[in-house]
Amino acid sequence: MTFRRLLLAGAAAVFATFGVITLVQAQSAGRQPDAKHGAVIVAQGTAAGAPPCAQCHAFNGVSDASGAFPRLAGQSAYYLTKQLRDFASGERASAIMSPIAKALSRDDIADVSTYFVGVNAPFLPLKAPDAALVKHGEELAQVGSAERRIQNCDNCHGPGGAGEPPAIPYLAGQYAHYIAFTLQMWRQGFRKNSLNTMGVIANKLDDEEIAAVAAYYQQVQSTLETVESQAKD
């Protein structure tokens, strides 16, 4: 059995044991998530004081080209729910997101997550990164480094960073600045709200490698879209 299969099997077991319970607890008993109510929260915020998600992430979940805030459109509802609950509990630290998540009820979190997973938003046109940097990132993402015992990113995040829902997020088309920042948080021990796989891997990457992986994943989705559009012409 390959490492990827072993890891995904382990993740599936953890999800089966704890993930379903978390999702059930994240909303009122017997209630189905309401994407329309989620859209209202994204646009207007809540009476409890949570600001509109759209202020930073945009109504369609693409955020902005700066990469200061992640792209949320199409991300798995389970993953988004877990992150919001972790922000609220303090398991994932953020001076910005923690107070916002605390102002959201369990139903609010479920509704917002369900809204974003259903959004099919375009990818913003971004400046092309350095080709050599992207090539280096592609090698790390697809092959890794056997010599340094660095697993390739695609093992967990899927071919081309498409993600492995429900627990593992997509990276394809995510902003390079955000990916690099998140890897730095894992490396420095400031983020640890999941299995320590990411912390172990991030600690083996230097700054240039982090920048390379981030640059590769930022452009991989737009490249796929270009190929698809050319095929239709």
Regions found by a protein language model. Name each.
Residues A39-A54, A77, V143-D154, P169-F181:
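Sequence context surrounding c-type heme c attachment/ligation sites in exported
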Residues Q55, D64-R71, D86-P129, P165-Y170, ...:
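Axial heme c-ligation environment in periplasmic c-type cytochrome domains
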Residues A50-F59, V112, I150-G160, V213:
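The canonical Cys-X-X-Cys-His
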